Amino acid sequence: MDKNWTTWNTQALQALDRGDIEQAERAFRQACVSGDPRADSNLGWFYFLMGGSVRDSEAEARYWIQKALQRSRHPRILQNIARLRFENGDFAGALAALQEAHQASQSPVLLYNLGVCHFGLGDKAAAAACFREADAANAADLLCAQCGAVHPRLAYAFCVQGEERTAALRRYAPERNDMELWDYVLLCVQCEAYAMAAPVLPELVSQWALTEQTLAMTALCLQHVPAEKERVLRCFSDELSEERDRLLHLLGDADECARLAASQPFFPPPATHEGYFTEECL
């Protein structure tokens, strides 16, 4: 092992912890002088995570991670290249990299991301199997709180149809977190479980952007559970009079309401894996 590389790598990660992005970039680049593919991968992952805050970050991320992959098929490098491919809409390429990584290293995050790729490719059966397995690993807290994903039960529910989707909704409902409220209401609407969504509508219209689809989902639920109408309308302040009027209009137009409620389909966000090689995994 190149001690010089590990030293620079540690300094880079410490700089990141301090929020010193420029020093982290310099140290990651210095680590790459060693020629170790893990150093190349770390630099690429740094650029990916920095996004537009660092000049030419997308091209740099692609260059360094691809360079690392040419010399190592380590599961972490494979997951890094998979995420780049996913962000570019190359679901097939991302899936291939994740499947190769999965042969060497299994984890709930990897399983979940396999499901996301299958979902993107339209293979809902394969996606459902992955989400079900990730859920069985009791990894929901890890996926949602640390990785930016959604509960695997929620993702699974959108992969199945009919009675199984309704059953999946009921299994998921007690586990719902606040960040998944919009998706939960969408799932309720698709399952025609309007009574399940009705109690959370005030929270929805108070905390989420009042897009056409949000208003349409709300109206659709209120059409079936009219007792909640006044409670929901009280959530609209004077500054939101236009949105309130739009909601009232949609309540009287069932066709437009149904069309708008289905305008943006659900798509599970990928889980952000641990992309850096740290001292613990060297």
Predicted regions and their residues:
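Terminal, low-structured helical/coil segments at or just beyond the last alpha-helical repeat
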Residues: 1-5, 144-147, 180, 231-282
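Alpha-helical tetratricopeptide repeat
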Residues: 2-16, 41-45, 79-80, 112, ...
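Short helix-capping/linker turns of helical repeat alpha-solenoids
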Residues: 3, 35-37, 50, 72-73, ...
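Alpha-helical segment of the N-proximal tetratricopeptide repeat
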Residues: 3-34, 48-52, 180-183, 187-188
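Start-of-helix register in tetratricopeptide repeats
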Residues: 6, 38-40, 76-77, 109, ...
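Residue-level recognition of tetratricopeptide repeat
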Residues: 13, 45, 49-52, 83, ...
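Structural signature of tandem alpha-helical TPR/SEL1-like repeats
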Residues: 17-27, 51-67, 88-100, 121-133, ...
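Conserved structural position within tetratricopeptide repeats
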Residues: 29-33, 66-70, 99-103, 132-136, ...
